[in-house]
Amino acid sequence: LPNATMIRSLIDLLRNLQSEEDCRLFLENIRWHGVPVCPHCGSKSEEHYKLTNGGVFRGLYKCKDCRERFTVTVGTMFEGSHIPLQKWFIAIYVFLAHKKGISSTQLHKDIAVTQKTAWFMLSRIRYSIRYNADIDFGDITQVDETYIGGKNKNRNAGKRLKNTRGRSLKLKAPVMGLLSDGKVYVEPIPKASKWILHGVINSLVPKGTTVVTDGWYGYKGLSENYVHKVVDHHRGEYVKGGYHTNSIEGFWSQLKRGIIGVYHLVTRKHLELYCDEFAYRYNTRNLTDGERFSQFLSIAKKRLRYRMLIL
């Protein structure tokens, strides 16, 4: 049976997962580890009934307990999709392996689907990532905020906006990031106010731990619940007493380069999905491309419907 150790590169994927049957067996191995699990009632058994069509078994089971029918794709991002699993696997592999991602205009050429289909596939992948973000914030958490968007000077003269300097929200969307033990959590926020910044930190970071920020006024008062270390960049401070925000600022560089270089433009509506995409790659940077691919398949349990995406 095809298994995770066989996929170490895109060539391995194409060589070992040539048919829909190969892909189905691989996904069953990743998700079920050899024993089918009913997604309806959770029953795990080798005695689930295998249903055939014309005498051929194609992965359709009937639960011996709840009697519901299921396949390995039910309850996953692949459920209800008419796109062959091999195309899905190729899309997922290159999406995760490329440090800055891949655009829908490129993907649709690579796997021979329409650009609209490629865009929806990438959105489904990001959506699945979004609902599997699980980070434990340790003893020290770096916190910072940044702004995602274009520059006013690059707009056509007739479309330039007034009063867009500094932290103006007319052109750019504020994004907040928290990094601890090498893992980053990213969340778009309405504005970088004290009330919002404190709210996010209080909801995620255990009280009494150390929080490191820059000198932005929105972080004032954190010392009431945390050991608050401030590295004031305006005073030329970048490392203070061993504390810094260099790691989260390095992540911002990756995020911005990826959006500008590959996607060019991201709307505020979908910004959260793109932030989660880059956070997932960052958080799994110590895995090989094959390991990251297999890990993603094991957690890809959220299905995004098209109407949810465009509303």
Locate predicted features:
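Residue-level recognition of single "structural anchor" positions
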Residues: 1-311
